[in-house]
Each structure stands twice: as C-alpha cells, then as structure tokens.
Amino acid sequence: DSGDAKFLDIAELSLFNNSLAGINLHGDRFFYVNPLEADGVRRFNHGNGGRAKWFGCACCPPNISRLILQVPGYMYAYSKDRVYLTLYGGSQTTIPLEGTRVKLEQTSAYPFDGKVRLMVQPENGSKFSVCMRIPTWARSDEFVPGGLYPYKQPKQAEVELSVNGQKTDFKMEKGFAVIKRDWKPGDVVELNIPMPVRFVDCIPEVSENIGKTAVTRGPLVYCAEEVDNAGPVQRLYLGDTNEAQAKVANISSGV
C-alpha cells in the first residue's frame, strides 16, 4: 500500500537469486535453507550437502513451485489512473482504469538485458500515467535499498526513457519513473537500463564480510561453481574490477 518501489526491488532480487536457486532445473530436488555458500560436504540441508529430494516437513517444495507460478500476477499493478510496471519480462495484460481499459504488451530479455519495450493499447484515447520501476541498483550507488551494500564503482550511465522513439521527460516518485500523457492505441514506451558488471561490498560493521565482494550485473548476483572453474572456488581473488565484462554462456537445458 505504500507505493514504494524499494519493496519490489527486494522482491525482484529474491526471485532471481534466492527463489530460483531453491529448486533444480528438473524440479525434483530442493533446498530447505538458503545457503550463501556451500562446499558440498557439510550437510547443511537436512542431512544433505546439496539439494534434497524431499523433507519430513515438506512445506518448501510446493511453496517454491507455487511462487514461480504466481510471478505473472506480480508484474503489474494499477490505481484508477495509473499503471505500474513492477517486474520486467515478456508478458501482456489488460488493466481496467477509470474510463478505459488498457492492454499492455511488454517485450524484454530482462534480467539479461536492460531494454524494455511496452506497447500501450487503450480502448480509446485517454490521459493516465504509466509508471516504470527504476531499480535501486540502476539509480544509486548501492545494490539494494537499506545502506548495507554499496557498489565499489560509481554509476556509469543514466537510465533512458522514450515514447514513440522520442526521449521523454519524467518525474521520479518512490522509485518509479512516471509518464503522464494522453495515450493513444499503439504508443510505445522504451526503457533502457544500463547493465555493466559491478562489484558490491558490505559495510565494515558486518565483520564476517570484510574482504569479500559480490559480482553483480543488473539484478543478478553471480555464483562461482567448481564445475565452471579450474579448481576450488572458496578463495577467489579479483583483480582490477574495472576490467570485468559480461559474456553469454550456453548452459545446459537451454538456460
């Protein structure tokens, strides 16, 4: 009810980095807890060093499956004269606003690409606001709201927003870029959120994390696994953090 996008920022990071890791690609093995690191030996997961097939109290497996199926319902929100894009990804929906119904069609490869294309199709020309969430990681010097996880590098580029190919002015309200105008069927909004590789530290008050950094790109936090590296990954050392680049890898099962 607060209308503050910071809660959606946390939800997005949890969906991409926590929830998806709780279930394997085949959908038949699960984490009961959420480890930030694991050596494959210590049996942290109800007697298992990795994901387990089932649990004595098996509330987690059906809940994670249910959550994944509920995600489409979290992608949009609305009030009488506003449409909110709360999560990004290919989708379409119809929103009932005061005086009109609006069909929205979103095209994007997010979270791997920061370009979002939104076609706005009101049943009749109408004035209302389209509100695009601009994540904390894209508009500030910290990865998530709260003051715990600052970036090593400063922000490198600004978010760009256009309507029908023309750069448009917008105002920020609680983490949303608000575009208020008379909309016509076929209007197209394009959002471009830069996604450089960035490194995240933790404030020194969290002593356990001193000397550690997280590698991120957009909303994704990357994990180092032995299968992808030539040796143990418990102690990896980063060189010049300004030299990092992202490459697309062809992972198994079409991911």
What are these regions, as identified by a protein language model?
Residues D1-A5:
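Active-site neighborhood of glycoside hydrolase catalytic domains
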Residues D9-N17, G22-Q121, R139-V163, T168, ...:
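C-terminal beta-rich recognition modules with glycine/proline-rich loops and embedded aromatic residues
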Residues E123-V130:
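Extended extracellular/luminal ectodomain segments enriched in beta-structured repeat modules
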